[in-house]
Amino acid sequence: MKKLAAIILALVMALGVTTISWASEVENVAQTTKGNTTTQYSSLAEALNAAKDGGMVELLKNVTLTGNWTTVGTESEPFKGTFDGKGYTITGLNIPTNDNEYVGLIGILHGGTVKNVKFASVSVTGKNDVGTAVGRIINGGTVSGVQVLGGTVSGAKRVGGVVGSIKANGTVSDCTNAAGVTANDRNAGGIVGSAYYTETGKQMYITGCVNNGAVTASGVCGGIVSLSAANVSGNTNTAAVKGTEVGGIVGEQKSYGSVTNNTNSGAVTNTGGNAAYGAGGIIGWLRYHETSEANAYPVSEIISVTGNKNSGSVTGKNDAGGIVGVVYNSAVIMNNKNTATSISAATFAAGIVGNYQTVETPAAEAPAQNKLTFGDDNTSTATLEQITAQCKDRLIYTNGNAIEIVEVPDPTPEQPPHYYYHPKTFDAGVGIYAVTAVLSVTGMAWTAKKRH
């Protein structure tokens, strides 16, 4: 009997050991919580798909993916849940060359959240709206705390290191990218490919992000975002940016939003034709929509560019600016600092704004035209010898018809500004333009007039 008992005990122990071994071979990597029910999965794809219509997905450990990834969250079935990476790393996200739109770990994020996850060794390729974490954000979705540690992200249009695009309403914050980003057509951004369209009562935000990956496009290109109607603040770019309408932070800021307290140290290069517009240390081109785009930009406001710093060289084609390459019509340009020692273009260049001009009012919804508020707290250390162009200036080059630039120093509380004028003129023009200055205690109004 003792021998039989010993044999039975040995068998039980062996079975127990075998059960533990089987469990370790199929380890759970994520869990999904919906309501009061939590389910663990050995497949990240299964966990994410289980929460597409709502719920929380959490990583339980680092994950190494094998094979090709199939994007979760499509146009017909977007991802509406929350994915919390808990600081873990997903290695080997591989999406091979294809003609699909909305490509990434998650294709379309509809009001959901992706946060606190790292990606290593990514290889993500699609057609349009391509990003490592999310292809497109809609309906107020949020992406935060995502780190892309290296690899490549590529496509035709709207390609971002973290997010391909934001449409009208959404937030990307505290993300970093070190992957190379390439758009074979246009709209490549180190963090977000494009943040575009406007809707009444809705806002887009890109804040506190860092890009360290080279960004290249055949068209609009930005170190943080390419085409933007978002509020872009507190971001840093250190990498080279090459494209047309190219900026160290924003390629083209259009119709709406603000660009504040960003820093660029990456070299900015316009690779377009000789007449290509816009190369800026912070923004390549600032402008407003045309009548044909009224449906895309039904809400407009004067764009503010304040508190930004650039130290990266700027090489343009038609124009280049240490902060903004080209400004159309209206903007508020205050308290920006350029320390780049090389700013060059064929025609127009300056330490802060390379080319300010007015164009015909784009649309009835566009803000009041022909007013540029340019603060005397904008500074540039670049000398005229370090600025190369046919028409150049230490701070801003004005170019156009009946242009008024208002320099507004901060008034002291003890002595509010008085609005009387003492006319005094001087010739401060370069090239074919002259500048007439009207001095007052409120500042200086500048008007560009063509030489005769």
Segments from the language model and where they lie:
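Sec-dependent signal peptide cleavage junction
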Residues: 15-28, 421-428, 448
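A cross-kingdom C-terminal cell-surface attachment/processing module
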Residues: 430-450
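Alpha-helical hydrophobic membrane-insertion segments
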Residues: 6, 19, 428-434
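Surface-exposed repetitive/solenoidal architectures
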Residues: 24-419
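ATP/adenylate-binding site constellation spanning eukaryotic-like Ser/Thr protein kinases
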Residues: 10, 111, 438
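Sec-dependent, cleavable N-terminal signal peptides
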Residues: 1-25, 452
